[in-house]
């Protein structure tokens, strides 16, 4: 049943930064086709993005970008920061769609990303302390798999990974557990697509999990097929704080979708694809960084207090 007050709040949760798009191919210091789907993390001296960059052959790599305010005056690495090892079966056709978390226990950043292998897309892991050198840990799970990120801490001694395998042709979100970041098990479906809804064809994790007092905020993308093509929009769910395989609430409606021209026109039309987020605790602002129409980067801004209010207005998740 519709909830008018919740739907009004959902419609107005995010505002687009007036300087969008914040990064485009024309800003790059070397020739590229497109830039999109960045991982994001807030550091003491500003915001760091690890952007997906598609070269003129159609292969993707990752490039570092930095900004003091997370919005403007971006420094961009003058060469690819992470490139595929084309001699590796795992990374034969490029690296895509990274997410970043800080692992307190290890004192390092964990980057999950999509490697395009000979067997299809799969999820890989790299560890770094400085974003200059990277320890590539290899594939985490077999293909076909995408849209993955670790939680920043363990649960009962185990790491948790949200990811989106394709199982029997269906694209639901799963969660898996590991004692050591190498051996994964206890696989279970976390969230399913919803037939006839805006997220009825495919879903996948958006940015990294965000811890709030009520639980873990999980932003995710949903896809709906229309006669004119697919539409990628963003929703949100709330997971239990200590048992993140339990979904507490889930938004019935989308909260961010393609509306601006730069989101509706590009390499792939009608796409808002979030892969990174930062939270400013002093201003209570959430920045969602996203690929717009698969060829540029934009940011949407919301108040965390309103996000928390909204998710608690959403219905409890069905088992």
Language-model features, listed with the residues they occupy:
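Beta-rich carbohydrate-recognition and catalytic domains
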Residues: 1-93, 102-201, 210-270, 281-319
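Acidic-residue sensor for enzyme active/binding pockets
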Residues: 96
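C-terminal substrate/ligand-recognition segments
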Residues: 275, 279
